[in-house]
Amino acid sequence: MAKKKERAVNVSGKPRHSLDVNRANDKKGAGGGAGGGGGGRSAATVRRLKMYKMRPLRDRGGKILKHDLQSKELPNTRIEPDRRWFGNTRVVNQKELEFFREELQSRLSNNYNVILKERKLPLSLLQDHQKQARAHLLDTEPFEHAFGPKGKRKRPKLMALDYESLLKKADDSQGAFEDKHATAKLLKEEEEDGLRDLVRHTMFEKGQSKRIWGELYKVIDSSDVVVQVLDARDPMGTRCYHLEKHLKENAKHKHLVFLLNKCDLVPAWATKGWLRTLSKDYPTLAFHASINSSFGKGSLLSVLRQFARLKSDKQAISVGFVGYPNVGKSSVINTLRSKSVCKVAPIPGETKVWQYITLTKRIFLIDCPGVVYQNNDSETDIVLKGVVRVTNLADASEHIGEVLRRVKKEHLKRAYKIEDWVDDNDFLVQLSKTTGKLLRGGEPDLTTTAKMVLHDWQRGKIPFFVPPPQQGEDSPSETAEPVDKSDEEGVSSDRTAAAMKAIAGIISSQQQMNVPCQKEFGVTNEDSEVAEQSE
């Protein structure tokens, strides 16, 4: 067979084929020439063009003889007849599975326990799935009476035999729907009492919009640990039971932690009582958000590091901070970072959308807007919880009566230098004259004065707190006075020592209950000792 001659490279100015290296590019500025234009094709261009013409070499029968840019077919192989290739990798009998299921349910009832290596557990076998309700058609009417030669009806009878049973079934389903949705039930109770607010300003529905709830669910879905921030002055009033129910039903693998913020506004015995009460449900920490002088920062960092170690199968964990508006979620994040990374303000609704903050390489923080779950709170309760901005209130004086009822008279005398008053209107008139809030003609400006009082209420200048239930031996009598920030400058050394002793009592009680706690008051070092959770 004659040897095939190789095509010689054309050195003339006009190449004969497109694969010639010396062929110039058509476009100016392209090609492999040194000058950028008029040069020959580069080696990469030649290889690319040659690739377009490459095909596998086949014989007359179509069998591939030589592969070119094709995957080679592996020859038929024989698998070694070993039991390890075909046997079960993990085997468990019914008795062991039942024992493990009971043990798992008993351990998961305690919110301080954490499942390790969730991906290796057959959770689908350990959880009892709810079965769908079946319509027992054969109990209502036999099969032969509905179909076949003896059939008497064109359709089989359903659960409702007549209109009365159908109406009863509809009423039952409506009752179940109303029980599930608390708002409908509350409206029904209001109608029975004969009182119902037909018109309510949209301002009192802040934190309940679809957009805000969407932000909350995005934060929950993205978080491995959810920290619910509560106001230490009214923890139960700022607690969202709907969120806890949602996590139990739909996200059992996520962990919930309570954070009692603003504990500097309440006495130590009240903080201790709320820690005992809330720790029965979820891990609870006391916290005071401040970049310079914080309390509880070491405990919270220790808990977050512990969760990061427990989630060792993940590269990083996300911690979402949720709660009512104006409870200090953004301030807590700024305290953990020791600098201002989130926009904060003493007014509700400052955070509009969720925000990712990097704490460490393995811990990320998520700031969430304040969310309010619709309940039977009145407009005054909504204002006093800090959900509504005081500057937007049309008539702020109508909420002062509740403030005078909740706060002791001696604290108001000490704060506003007013000796006595008859009602809320008289109180506002005297305060307007004292502070110089007057209109033309010397008339008192009641609206501006009322807004000033509500601002002082929301910012903690007026001492107020809800006492914890089942007060123990450490709690004082009912005549105990709340913390008054106006006397902080004149506190003697004896009272300071007593306060430090009470805080030490809180820390010791947390250690006895296996609650993560901060070892020293005022410690902000991130390398503090890790608190251990109960197993």
From Swiss-Prot:
For this record, the Gene Ontology CC terms, alphabetical, are:
nucleolus
Q: Which residues form the CP-type G domain?
A: 213-374
Query: Gly residues bias: where?
Result: 30-41
Subcellular localization: Nucleus, Nucleolus; Nucleus
* Start and end residues of each stretch annotated as G5: 290-292
Chain segments carrying region Disordered = 1-42, 464-495
Molecular function per GO: GTP binding; hydrolase activity
Asked if NAD is a keyword of the record, the answer is no
Residue ranges, annotated region (G2): 349-353
Q: Region G1: start and end of each range?
A: 323-330
The segments labelled G3 in the record are 367-370
* Sequence segments annotated as region (G4): 261-264
Which family is annotated? Belongs to the TRAFAC class YlqF/YawG GTPase family. RsgA subfamily.
Q: What's the protein here called?
A: Nuclear/nucleolar GTPase 2
Organism listed in the record:
Oryza sativa subsp. indica (Rice)
